[in-house]
């Protein structure tokens, strides 16, 4: 039974929701702030705080857990990616790998003394197309 186990489903399947949160987490870590709707931000805050807690541990096990949570795959380059790498265009391939480095090196050390509450949600106005309330979720800068 699911008593007291509430998950914000956001009207998505489990796989869609996991991929969406992984992509939002990668964007949040790399940019340190993203604009989204309020329900998504409130659900994402839980995962973002968990990532910082892993980064503060800074162990091999914590890195592997973060890689699994962010769905980063270390597959060999496809022929198309190999051609792009020869031309010097490796940015798209390396973006996911840089996220782990920033998480553990920059954000983990920034929040080393803080015990929780690493994110802030700032509400904005309503979106024009569907009148959804938008907000900015960002990591604190202390």
UniProtKB/Swiss-Prot annotation:
Signal peptide segment: none
One Pfam family from the record: Ribosomal_L17
Gene3D superfamilies: Ribosomal protein L17
UniProtKB keywords: Ribonucleoprotein, Ribosomal protein
One GO molecular-function entry: structural constituent of ribosome
GO biological process: translation
Alphabetical list of InterPro entries matching this protein: Ribosomal_bL17, Ribosomal_bL17_CS, Ribosomal_bL17_sf
GO cellular component: cytosolic large ribosomal subunit
Domain of life of the source: Bacteria
Quaternary data: Part of the 50S ribosomal subunit. Contacts protein L32.
Family assignment from sequence similarity: Belongs to the bacterial ribosomal protein bL17 family.
Name listed for the protein in its UniProt record: Large ribosomal subunit protein bL17
Taxonomic source organism: Protochlamydia amoebophila (strain UWE25)
């Amino acid at each position: 039974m699911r008593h007291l186990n509430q998950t914000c489903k956001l009207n998505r399947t489990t796989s869609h929701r996991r991929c969406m949160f992984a992509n939002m987490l990668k964007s949040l870590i790399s940019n340190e702030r993203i604009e989204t709707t309020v329900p998504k931000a409130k659900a994402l805050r839980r995962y973002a705080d968990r990532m910082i807690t892993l980064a503060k541990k800074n162990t091999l096990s914590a890195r592997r857990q973060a890689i699994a949570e962010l769905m980063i795959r270390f597959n060999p380059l496809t022929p198309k990616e190999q051609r792009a790498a020869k031309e010097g265009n490796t940015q798209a391939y390396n973006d996911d790998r840089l996220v782990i480095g920033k998480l553990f090196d920059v954000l983990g050390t920034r929040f080393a003394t803080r015990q929780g509450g690493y994110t802030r949600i700032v509400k904005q106005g309503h979106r024009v197309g569907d009148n959804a309330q938008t907000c900015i979720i960002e990591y604190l800068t202390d």
